[in-house]
């Protein structure tokens, strides 16, 4: 059976026909008082370009995001069904974006070949999921029910914490109140936002006066959540909007120490579409249980 994977910009993956991996754009909108410019995240705007724009944006310039349209999904799927027996779709987490609904509309018309997963995943978690699905397909006959059950269990084993100091994008996107933002900024707190694969929701859960204290709180929280479902941790990832290599190396080493050197921590840049909401100098620690 020929299988392809279809994802979107939030995966931060590059399209590869050799790997049977295809990527659809999510969009970043730069709004000025005079006009709007739309970019395809990961296609015609990368993280460095976006963060430079955000850092140097004059007053009145705003950045927002937009979903993948039904028409874009439909066009790609209609092309892929001619080449593959099964297309597995993994769109951005439905708790973060309405894009998932557009994918499901297209799925109805290609039900025998297009399977959209309720993965509630973003970033590196999607890459891990693709690899684990490939392993599952090697040892299990494909069925919608079987793969959905596998993904439901997978979700329980993934979690992340986002570290934020620039709260303006979160306020603009309605994900943080002005009052909380004012308190955090005034007292120079580090804001911690959790992401649990089990429910796919982003939730403010704590704050800390120092980065080190924030990191300790995050690791404690993640281990508590994941070790309810797993005997031990399997892998980790550090995702960043920071371009200073030494800063990133120091952060990875700190997380490695807090995790007792128990897992390998991959390192990658955060996707532009997520950075639009998390702001400058944000970073994420992602963990997965066995």
Swiss-Prot record:
Record keywords: Lipid-binding
Protein name: DegV domain-containing protein MG450 homolog
Protein's job: May bind long-chain fatty acids, such as palmitate, and may play a role in lipid transport or fatty acid metabolism.
Record GO terms (molecular function): lipid binding
NCBIfam families xrefs: DegV
Superkingdom of the organism of origin: Bacteria
Entries under PANTHER family matching the protein: DEGV DOMAIN-CONTAINING PROTEIN DR_1986-RELATED (PTHR33434), FATTY ACID-BINDING PROTEIN TM_1468 (PTHR33434:SF2)
Coiled-coil boundaries: none
Organism, as annotated: Mycoplasma pneumoniae (strain ATCC 29342 / M129 / Subtype 1) (Mycoplasmoides pneumoniae)
């Amino acid at each position: 059976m020929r299988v392809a994977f279809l994802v979107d910009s939030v995966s931060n993956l590059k399209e590869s026909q050799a790997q049977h991996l295809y990527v659809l754009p999510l969009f970043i909108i730069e709004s000025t008082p005079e006009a709007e410019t739309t970019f395809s995240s990961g296609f015609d705007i990368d993280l460095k370009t976006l963060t430079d724009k955000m850092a140097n944006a004059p007053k009145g310039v705003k950045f927002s995001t937009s979903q993948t349209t039904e028409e874009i999904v439909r066009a790609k799927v209609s092309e892929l069904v001619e080449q593959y027996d099964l297309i597995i779709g993994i769109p951005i987490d439905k708790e973060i974006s309405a894009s998932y609904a557009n994918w499901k509309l297209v799925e109805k018309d290609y039900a025998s070949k297009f399977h959209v997963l309720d993965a509630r995943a973003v970033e590196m978690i999607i890459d891990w999921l693709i690899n684990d699905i490939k392993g599952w397909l090697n040892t299990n006959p494909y069925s919608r029910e079987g793969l959905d059950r596998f993904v439901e269990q997978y979700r329980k084993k993934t979690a992340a914490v986002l570290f934020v100091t620039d709260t303006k994008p979160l306020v603009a996107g309605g994900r943080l109140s002005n009052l909380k933002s004012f308190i955090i900024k005034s007292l120079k707190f580090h804001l911690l936002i959790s992401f649990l694969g089990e429910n796919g929701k982003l939730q403010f859960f704590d704050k800390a006066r120092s980065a080190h204290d924030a990191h300790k709180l995050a690791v404690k929280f993640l281990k508590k959540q994941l070790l309810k479902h797993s005997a031990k941790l399997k892998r980790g990832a550090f995702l960043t909007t920071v371009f200073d290599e030494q800063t990133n190396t120091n952060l990875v080493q700190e997380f490695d120490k807090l995790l007792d050197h128990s897992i390998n921590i991959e390192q990658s840049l955060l996707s532009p579409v997520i950075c639009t909401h998390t702001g400058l100098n944000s970073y994420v620690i992602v963990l997965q249980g066995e």
